């Protein structure tokens, strides 16, 4: 929709992907620190129909284009995003490219070759890119249930927050965690987060489970 794009951009599940928004106007509410789902933007590219360069919202801290530029995320506007969505619906996920600067002047055949040479998502493991490197704990709120071991394969901050609100002391462990690391917490349950890449590349995590 017109809002929620900040949560999408900072969702680790979209690492390595170009995201296409179907709502026509994006950027109206700007960007703020409260709605971020992780420590940075993870998408590789951002495609919108119409970009609002000047936000109008009392919670806005910075314009969307400024944050994209600061983090080196390429974006494109003035695109028929719904036509792209219809194509993706029929053909499925595919490799793509957004070219800017000098790369935008390359011959289309060269641009296509660069896209075709890019990595496919099949067999790709991106969990090590997005996971925490050290364990962190989010204390329980309300009636305490006990410790919950969360294997961070690309978890969103809102998920951690909601688990804590339901009474768990949320221990967010790196994706490299072993069974010994999990057992040391003496958890009442183990939670595997969602994340980016191909689930088939997570055999090690499945083996622990």
Task: Give a label for each model feature.
Residues 1-180, 184-185, 199:
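RNA-binding accessory domains that recognize and position tRNA/RNA substrates
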Residues 184-209:
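Cysteine-nucleophile active-site neighborhood
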């Amino acid at each position: 929709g017109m809002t929620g794009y900040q949560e999408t951009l900072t969702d680790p599940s979209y690492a390595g992907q170009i995201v296409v928004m179907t709502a026509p106007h994006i950027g109206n509410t700007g960007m703020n620190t409260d709605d971020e789902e992780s420590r940075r933007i993870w998408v590789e590219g951002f495609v919108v129909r119409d970009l609002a360069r000047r936000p109008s919202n009392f919670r806005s801290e910075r314009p969307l284009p400024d944050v994209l530029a600061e983090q080196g995320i390429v974006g494109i506007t003035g695109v028929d995003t719904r036509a792209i969505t219809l194509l993706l619906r029929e053909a499925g996920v595919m490799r793509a490219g957004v070219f800017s600067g000098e790369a935008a002047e390359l011959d289309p055949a060269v641009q296509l070759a660069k896209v075709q040479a890019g990595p496919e998502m099949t067999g790709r493991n991106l969990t090590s890119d997005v996971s925490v490197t050290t364990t962190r704990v989010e204390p329980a709120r309300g009636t305490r249930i006990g410790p919950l071991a969360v294997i961070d394969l690309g978890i969103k901050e809102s998920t951690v927050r909601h688990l804590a609100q339901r009474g768990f002391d949320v221990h967010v462990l790196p994706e490299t965690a072993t069974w010994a690391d999990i057992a040391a917490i003496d958890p009442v349950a183990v939670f595997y987060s969602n994340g980016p890449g191909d689930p088939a590349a997570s055999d090690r995590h499945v083996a622990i489970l």
